[in-house]
Amino acid sequence: MAKEDTIKIEGSVEELLPNMHFRVSLQNGLNVIAHLCGKMRMKNIRVLVGDVVTVEMSPYDLSKARIIFRQR
C-alpha cells in the first residue's frame, strides 16, 4: 500500500488503553483504536485524554489508526 492511499482525519482522544493504545473519537463520529507512530514514541511525545490528534487510517481497515500528530 502506498503512502498516498492513507486517510488522514482529526479526532480527540477519549480513553487511554494498555500498551500505548488509545480510543479516538473522530470528527465523523466513528470511534477507532489508535497507536502512536514510531517517531512519536522515539521523541517521547505524551498524548493525554482530551488531546486533539491527527490520525492516519488504511482504507482496508477503518477500525484501526495510527496517531501521527498531536495538536498544541
Swiss-Prot record:
GO terms for molecular function: ribosome binding; rRNA binding; translation initiation factor activity. Keywords: Cytoplasm, Initiation factor, Protein biosynthesis, RNA-binding, rRNA-binding. Coiled coil: none annotated. Its main location: cytoplasm. It is found in: Cytoplasm. Residues 1-72 form the S1-like domain. GO terms for cellular component: cytosol. It holds the Pfam family eIF-1a. InterPro entries: NA-bd_OB-fold, RNA-binding_domain_S1_IF1, TIF_IF1. Component of the 30S ribosomal translation pre-initiation complex which assembles on the 30S ribosome in the order IF-2 and IF-3, IF-1 and N-formylmethionyl-tRNA(fMet); mRNA recruitment can occur at any time during PIC assembly. HAMAP family: IF_1. Belongs to the IF-1 family. One of the essential components for the initiation of protein synthesis. Stabilizes the binding of IF-2 and IF-3 on the 30S subunit to which N-formylmethionyl-tRNA(fMet) subsequently binds. Helps modulate mRNA selection, yielding the 30S pre-initiation complex (PIC). Upon addition of the 50S ribosomal subunit IF-1, IF-2 and IF-3 are released leaving the mature 70S translation initiation complex. This is Translation initiation factor IF-1. It comes from Protochlamydia amoebophila (strain UWE25).
